[in-house]
Amino acid sequence: MNVRQRYREILKGPGLTFAPGAYDALSARIMEHCGFKVITAGGYAAVGSLLGEPDGGQSNYREYADHYGRICDAVDLPIFCDADTGFGGVHNIRKMVRAFERAGVAALFLSDQVFPNRCGYMPGK
């Protein structure tokens, strides 16, 4: 069973599933060691760990896919990832989804806001 199928099975299961947020491969390994069954990887955490800055649209989908791919390679768990606003229009979203699939991402979520996104934790949003 691949990670996408495992993720669907976990979602169908009884009760709640806690999915802590990993910001890199090491934090994902720690979460796996602690017994979590699913991990979330957020955009703010990705950009923060890569650049030391808030997520303000300065990274592209390839950088996210590379980062999420390193997390996926480090663990044998489904990873649920932040795909920001999809990084542009419908054609970019299609490319982004394919890149995330190749990286090993089990599922993703999109923000319902304008592109480039504005960091939800910062003033002015």
Residue ranges of predicted features:
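N-terminal amphipathic alpha-helix/helix-capping segment at the start of soluble metabolic enzymes
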Residues: 1-21, 25-34
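Alpha-helix-loop-beta-strand connector modules within alpha/beta enzyme cores
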Residues: 2-9, 13, 52-81, 103, ...
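Hydrophobic faces of well-ordered beta-strands that scaffold small-molecule active sites
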Residues: 18-24, 39-41, 79-83, 108-110
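Glycine-rich anion/phosphate-binding loops
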Residues: 20-25, 58-63, 84-103
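Conserved functional loop/turn residues at catalytic and ligand-binding sites
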Residues: 35, 104, 109
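Glycine-rich, proline-tolerant flexible connector loops at the mouths of alpha/beta enzymes
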Residues: 38-63, 85-90, 109-125
